[in-house]
Amino acid sequence: MDLNTLLETTVVGLGYELVDVEMSPRGRTIRVFIDAPAKETGIDVEDCAKVSNQLTRVFEVENFDFDRLEISSPGLDRVVKKAADFERFSGQEIQIKVRIPQGGRRNFQGELLGLKDGKVGLRLAKDDVELEFTNIEKARLVPRFD
């Protein structure tokens, strides 16, 4: 079983959402970002400890070698990757970087309008744009401090 499948199965099985995974260049440190959409208070230390303990056991059973495992909440500027995320965070400020420039630009920031027919809607200062979901390289929420 590959690492991503192992992580997804374990994290979802514990009732959390796997948001993102980062690995150090040599693969010795694994950073796992989890969320609990059903929980109003978000992720806390107990949630991280629960996932860490379970993943450590699973890695031992699967004989997966690593030096360090870090479990964290996705933070205020969380990564937005899955199609469902682009719907869930509709109405929020987002930064998007595309692989292939659109209108001479690769970077966009504006209000997320959602995902429809494979296109992500974005309200910019002057107009609205639609970006191909498959062309998105990276997307992050932009925290607001009002």
Swiss-Prot record:
It is found in: Cytoplasm. One of its GO terms (cellular component) is cytosol. One of its GO terms (biological process) is ribosomal small subunit assembly. Keywords: Cytoplasm, Ribosome biogenesis. HAMAP family: RimP. PANTHER family: RIBOSOME MATURATION FACTOR RIMP (PTHR33867:SF1). Belongs to the RimP family. Required for maturation of 30S ribosomal subunits. This is Ribosome maturation factor RimP. It comes from Dechloromonas aromatica (strain RCB). The gene is rimP.
